[in-house]
Amino acid sequence: MKSLSLILSALAVQVAVAQTPDKAKEQHPKLETYRCTKASGCKKQTNYIVADAGIHGIRQKNGAGCGDWGQKPNATACPDEASCAKNCILSGMDSNAYKNAGITTSGNKLRLQQLINNQLVSPRVYLLEENKKKYEMLHLTGTEFSFDVEMEKLPCGMNGALYLSEMPQDGGKSTSRNSKAGAYYGAGYCDAQCYVTPFINGVGNIKGQGVCCNELDIWEANSRATHIAPHPCSKPGLYGCTGDECGSSGICDKAGCGWNHNRINVTDFYGRGKQYKVDSTRKFTVTSQFVANKQGDLIELHRHYIQDNKVIESAVVNISGPPKINFINDKYCAATGANEYMRLGGTKQMGDAMSRGMVLAMSVWWSEGDFMAWLDQGVAGPCDATEGDPKNIVKVQPNPEVTFSNIRIGEIGSTSSVKAPAYPGPHRL
């Protein structure tokens, strides 16, 4: 759903994946997560958070930059991959640097702030293993994923996102001797939008390739609207595209198969206040169930919420065309016009990437390009054409932020003490 203009504004502070780390100490924020089974409940696990490599501060030795998002690397610094690795320096981030980038943790809570002292930071972070050297690879086909979220400070035009990317577990460090940063410094980002970035797998992107991989948007939302969308690609892992491969009919589904309650004409489901089934001004739990068949193929994506200790099932489709269900499957996607999704293999293709393993990414951002219209304007939500303008966002909320907490992963039906249907809604397997 996201256009290049959207991403350019959101990532202006994130230059790109950098190269050789300097001697500044990296101090990853600790984050407690949980792994759950029906038999034993949820057990705490230690993870760490790393900021995207572009947030670390990327520069040449003379202080000049090494390239901007949407472009090849600086030609002077990066005439070839080896020179790029030598000339482009990445700075480690200590605890104060993380705070100044709008990233703080406490126990199982992760807080992401859009502004620090009125300066745009718009952080994006990834989940590391306890050893901090590799990303935690999540294998979610046939499982359940839950988290708590606080959305009150995200008005129209904001996006607090939690999603999966099929990034390389080591951040691309093993792909080349010129890849120096790795997962430890947040390298190796990719998604289904296939944007050109100065570095690919942590190596100078001399050819100017688009950086593609499978993407599953579990949660893109503000306090007015929510969005779920799987984005499959025809190639496994991180792939450098060229030409038409990078386009809207290329190797990745850029639009995805989306679910937004407003778009299915259930406008009283989610919003600010007690008149909505899910009140976004108070903390709530988001539970996603990735249902597989006996062959292990992903066939459905289910969602329910928990607030005030009560399960709130997703509403059933209330528009003509799609089947009257409350989850995503191939029939729903085909009926809603997700043609690229179906062409690229649909739900099974997304599940194949989830089975191989994907990295958890979390971010907060706004869009100076279209004010996040695709998320919360028109049929997508109640926001008007200008509410999402960053100049207006700060008038409503001077300090936009989101807090994700209590991340729990396990077999279906295991991540909450509140009893919920194994497969929410009228449909049963």
From Swiss-Prot:
Its EC number is 3.2.1.4. Gene3D superfamilies: Glycoside hydrolase, family 7, domain. The modification Pyrrolidone carboxylic acid is found at Q19. Keywords: Carbohydrate metabolism, Cellulose degradation, Disulfide bond, Glycoprotein, Glycosidase, Hydrolase, Polysaccharide degradation, Pyrrolidone carboxylic acid, Signal. Disulfide bonds join C36-C42, C66-C88, C78-C84, C156-C383, C190-C213, C194-C212, C233-C252, C241-C246, C257-C333. The active site is at E215, E220. Pfam families: Glyco_hydro_7 (PF00840). It catalyses: Endohydrolysis of (1->4)-beta-D-glucosidic linkages in cellulose, lichenin and cereal beta-D-glucans. One of its GO terms (molecular function) is cellulase activity. Glycans are attached at N74, N265, N318. SUPFAM superfamilies: Concanavalin A-like lectins/glucanases (SSF49899). Transmembrane segments: none annotated. Belongs to the glycosyl hydrolase 7 (cellulase C) family. This is Endoglucanase type C.
